[in-house]
Amino acid sequence: MVLEQVAFDIETTGFNVDDEVTTVGFAVPMGVRVFVQTGERDAPGIESAVESEVSETLVRVSAHASESELLAAVSEFVAERIRDDMLLVAYNGERWNGGFDVPFLRTRYAQRDLAWPFVDVPYADVMPLVTDRFNTTVDGTEQGDLVTAYDVLCDGSYGDLDPFDDSAEAVAAFEDGRFAELVLHNVADVLRTRALGRVAERYCSKSEFKVKSLTPTRSI
């Protein structure tokens, strides 16, 4: 049985241990589900602003006042929607020697003393598949980042959704309260990740996905 992929991606206020998660997005079979925190600021109309820019994909957005509320909402979503016949995938989310999204989330859940949501959830990282099993060399230089890999292997239009030239701009967008732009960037990234995951499904064996469990050793 081939597990149905659910791509996810996060945005943060930075890379330090005390930085926070600002956005979590999932590309589910019916569309994209995004959770964004506003830092206690009013943020009306985010979903409608995003919908006006994304015509071919159903996007649902919920705004949360704080990181704690965002993480709690993500946990509820995972419990209700992510089943054991689905495969959670990310791009540089967590690899054997590093990664970003999963370690960052794990740290924030631990610091908030919240239960880890990804129980009985299989996970695979798309980045090693792309960089090890495909040629992503451009102009003589290997380019393993998400944007370039998507452009090289998928040649699709999801990049047109992204208002940022660099992911670092997501930090400034949160600080400035440009939440619709932040969400659009996240939507573009989860859709690019999903597209690369599907390419890997077409051309790589199941064993090369190196699926692992995210279930913790203890539940309490």
For each of these PLM feature ranges, what is it?
Residues M1-E4, V211-I220:
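Terminal disorder- and signal-encoded targeting elements
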Residues Q37-R41, E208-P216:
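Short alpha-helical "patches" and their helix-cap loops
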Residues P29, L87-K210:
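Metal-dependent phosphoesterase core characteristic of DEDDh/y 3'-5' exonuclease domains
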